[in-house]
A protein has these predicted regions:
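Residue-level signal for short segments within beta-strands and strand-turn junctions
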Residues: 39, 93, 111-112
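Short beta-strand edge/turn micro-motifs at domain boundaries
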Residues: 103-134
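Short beta-strand segments enriched in hydrophobic/aromatic residues
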Residues: 31, 89-91, 124-127
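Outer-membrane beta-barrel domain signature
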Residues: 95-97
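Class I (Rossmann-like) S-adenosyl-L-methionine-dependent methyltransferase catalytic domain
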Residues: 137-140
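Short helix-adjacent coil turns
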Residues: 15, 22-23
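A solvent-exposed, acidic/Ser-Thr-rich amphipathic alpha-helical stretch
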Residues: 3-10, 24-88, 100-101
Length: 140
């Protein structure tokens, strides 16, 4: 039986592979129903269905879009079925006809589901490096 750490790392790899394969259905399966994201540009989405639809839109509008999340560390509360993942992300996409790159750090909260799988509750991405032409978030 895999450890919780291995299960979370495997789920992250499935998420990366789903992005590579443009597979929004698999992404949805990895998310808690009340999933919440704050993107690297500070956009926010709530709910597994909304997030899967957002990915489907990205895949349809920009076939060059690719994002990879690389886990640095995972801290697990086995008794409560909670975990925090910290890592680095990198992405590239087409903007105004030009391929641009961005990268940064992320934090993810995982929760063990009733069936024993680990699903993402929330992810927060912070952009640290970016190519000229990347669009920053609007000020709050």
């Amino acid at each position: 039986m895999p450890t919780s750490n291995e299960m979370i790392r495997n789920a992250r790899e499935r998420f990366n592979k789903a992005i590579e394969d443009k597979d929004a259905a698999t992404i949805r399966m990895l998310l808690a129903p009340t999933y919440h994201i704050v993107t690297g540009r500070s956009d926010q989405n709530h709910g597994a269905g909304e997030e899967a639809a957002r990915w489907a839109g990205v895949f349809q509008s920009d076939p060059t879009a690719i994002y990879i999340r690389t886990t640095r560390e995972i801290t697990i509360n086995e008794a409560w079925g909670l975990a925090e993942e910290l890592g680095n992300w990198q992405g590239s996409y087409t903007l105004a006809g030009k391929l641009v790159n961005a990268s940064g750090v992320y934090s993810a909260k995982w929760q063990r589901a009733r069936n024993g799988d680990w699903v993402l509750q929330t992810e927060v991405f912070t952009t640290i490096e970016f190519d000229e032409g990347c669009v920053p978030p609007e000020p709050i």
